[in-house]
Amino acid sequence: MSNTKRKLNKLLKEGDQIVWVTCYDSSFSIILDKVGVDIVLVGDSLGMVIKGEENTHSVTMNNILYHVSNVAKNKKNFILMADMPKNSYKDFKTASRNAKELLKNKVDIVKIEYRDDNRETLEKL
């Protein structure tokens, strides 16, 4: 069992609330780690929050990876989760390559939106 699974199982067994926060930069990740946040998400919501777009559709893997690298620099205790943005998992080969890239950059959990048209890809992953 991975450290991430062990930590999540422990949190669930203890019955405490899991504290999960979205973060996009190094300075806030330091604070979140110090105050004991359990899970930090680098989400595709950065399209709206950081880039000022109306939705998340313009977010690329490079955008996510940039913010993941900033957040991961200070990761000591929290579980790092990252979204795979739209079009980063359009087929198994693309999804696999992008998920591996996130994992190489200290991401513990890769978050992918389920849709009927990507079910087969998700099952393979």
What are these regions (language model features)?
Residues M1-T22:
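N-terminal amphipathic alpha-helix/helix-capping segment at the start of soluble metabolic enzymes
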Residues S2, C23, S58-N62:
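Conserved phosphate-coordination/catalytic loops
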Residues L11, L32, V71, L102-L103, ...:
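Generic structural signal for hydrophobic
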Residues L11-I18, E53, L102, K106-D108:
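Short, basic, glycine/proline-bearing loop/turn elements
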Residues Q17-W20, V37-V40, F78-M81, D108-I109:
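Structural motif
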Residues V21, D25, L32, V71, ...:
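Conserved, mostly hydrophobic/aromatic
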Residues F28-S29, V35, I39-L65, K86-Y89, ...:
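Glycine-rich, proline-tolerant flexible connector loops at the mouths of alpha/beta enzymes
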Residues N63, H67-V68, A72-Y114:
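Glycine/small-residue-rich loop that forms an oxyanion/phosphate-binding "nest" at active or ligand-binding sites
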